[in-house]
Swiss-Prot record:
This is GMP synthase [glutamine-hydrolyzing]. Its EC number is 6.3.5.2. InterPro entries: Class_I_gatase-like, GATASE, GMP_synth_C, GMP_synth_GATase, GMP_synthase, GMPS_ATP_PPase_dom, NAD/GMP_synthase, Rossmann-like_a/b/a_fold. It holds the Pfam family GATase. The active site is at 88 (nucleophile), 176, 178. It is an enzyme of class 6 (ligase). PANTHER family: GMP SYNTHASE [GLUTAMINE-HYDROLYZING], GMP SYNTHASE-RELATED.
Amino acid sequence: MAQKDMQDFDKIIVLDYGSQYNQLITRRIREFGIFSELLPNTTTAAEIKKIAPKGIIFSGGPMSVYDGGAFSVDPEIFELGIPILGICYGMQLISFKNGGNVEASTEREYGKAEITVTDKDSDLFKGLPEKQTVWMSHGDKVTAIPEGYVTVAESDNTPFTAIENRDKHIYGIQFHTEVQNTEFGNDILKNFAFGVCGAQDNWTMNDFIDMQIEKIREQVGDKKVLLGLSGGVDSSVVGVLLHRAIGDQLVSIFVDHGLLRKGEVEQVMESLGGKFGLNIIQVDAKERFMSKLAGVSDPEKKRKIIGNEFIQVFDEEATKLNGIDFLAQGTLYTDIIESGTSTATTIKSHHNVGGLPEDMQFSLIEPLNTLFKDEVRDLGEKLGMPYELVWRQPFPGPGLGIRVLGEVTEDKLKIVRDSDLILREEFALAGLDKTVWQYFTVLPGIRSVGVMGDGRTYDYTVGIRAVNSIDGMTADFSRIPWDILQKVSVRIVNEVDHVNRIVYDITSKPPSTVEWE
């Protein structure tokens, strides 16, 4: 059977106009089984023609289409005959470029709004209720639609909430289908993707695995690849995927800096080195890191010390190896998007990964750079990786070094390790380990008076942090049931030495960050 490539899959591309929800649009389309990618708004009609997508989506954005310097579009894209859906700014751009009118709205709409579908023959709203709740986020609105377009939905403040040109298959909606607050958002996107574009849901993770293995083998040949294992999800999945493709041509370096979670070193070595057979060079650098951190309390100094020391250790080990031609990284699609939707930009900015010396010339392999985080977890499961590795909590590069506020000592690290394990165990028992985006314990360095048994104590406070987020840019504290928090609290106080008080962090991001340091 012939090997599949990207030309074998239907695609819908999203042009990036700066919306905070851009990644969500792409993810929603992929969830339908259709491959989707985010491209710069400067992408030309000729470039799109080569990609041959089934559909094009113009995203939302913060600009006003009538301002000088506003993001625009190659007008030839409207003549390709490929269905187009404009969302928010995208709809305004379609109207503006085709003879309609867009003005600043006297009443801005941010948040939930009620719309009414006014055309029962609408392609976008086919099979959906007349009244719907949607999520608006706009300060401009269309005040006159182009010739050939019809209005298919309206709201009290926005008479042209959705428009269609069925002859040219060009559509616009003023609200955001991609966010959960839009009641029938997925259905509208499905009507566009399947009904209008005629796309097939033929994109699967198993196809991705087969294509990546073939691609890696072609790229690497008989040469060797170096991977820095952190114990996190991304590098672990990269390791297993590469090993399946090229076996022992992959050499991994795992630096134990003494700032990992309880049982993490053993789990990585037993699972990746044992079950999956990765060739792992384990470096015990605990004493080296702790000696450098002694007496240091400033969080930025701690980060720099940990980062620089990690680079140095990795460099020392890498220079001992001969015949390495490739460096593998766990770069995700989100990293590329945040670098300006440009793969070339990302490769350049990440090329000297970990501060590797300039004379160590590696070619870069980034097998996950078209995937989102949730897709990486799906990939890990398809590769047969254990639940504990695939669903491991996000973990900062400096590790527990920034979850111990102030000076890092072995005693303080033990408190964080033990309390964090209890939190993870109880969240797993309660089924919260997949529903809460990130959760961990932190040692603020606060000591307070308590009573345990018949005696007075003066011990540490442990903080619990649990948040929900989509992309980490903003986050809201999780509403954890009190009985679960109480159980965690009782266990930590009883099972972890030198702790007599537990607090729960109920601040969101912003104003706080997810991590305390």
